[in-house]
Amino acid sequence: MFYSGTIPNEIPMNNYCLEVIRQDLTQTRTIELPSPAELTLTNDQAVISIKRFGLTANNITYGVAGDIIGYWQFFPAEGDYGRIPVWGIGTVIASGQTDLKVGDEYYGYYPMASYLVVNPAQATTQGFKDGAEHRGEWF
C-alpha cells in the first residue's frame, strides 16, 4: 500500500527489522524491535542506528545463496525467516566502547533494520570488526 501526504497514525514508525522467508524471498514481514533505550548493553557492545542502505539485485543474490554461502548467519532470525544483508551507513547512538564514540559513522554490512547491536573488536581509526560470536567466522 502506498500513501501520499501525511502517514496515518496506525502505521508503526518505531524500530523495525525486515525479514523474509528464506525459501521464498517474496514473503516478508516487518517485526518491531525494542527501543535502543530499553536495551541492556554490556561494556563491549555498541548500538548503531542504520541511517541509509542500498538495496540492489546483489542483495537478492545474498538471499538466494544464503544457505550455501552463509549469509543467513550474519543476522540470525527465528524459524524459517532470514535477514538479507545490505550495505549502508550507520551512526553510533550508544556505546560502552572507548573506541566507538556516540556520533561516529560507519559504512558497513547491516540488516534491513532500524539499528544493530555490535560487539566491536579490532577497532582502528579506519573501522572495526564485529566480534559477535555468530558473525565471528564471517567478519
Q: Can you say where each PLM-predicted feature lies in the sequence?
A:
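A short N-terminal beta-strand-loop micro-motif at the entrance of redox/enzyme domains
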Residues: 22-52, 57
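N-terminal amphipathic/basic-hydrophobic helices that include classical n-h-c signal peptides
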Residues: 1-12, 56-57
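Cytochrome P450 core scaffold surrounding the K-helix E-X-X-R motif
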Residues: 58-63
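Short, compositionally biased
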Residues: 116-138
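Hydrophobic, helix-prone linear segments
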Residues: 7-31
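Glycine-rich beta-strand-centered segment in the early N-terminal region that forms part
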Residues: 42-53, 67-117, 122
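Short, well-ordered strand-loop elements centered on a beta-strand within folded domains, enriched
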Residues: 28-32, 99-105, 123-130
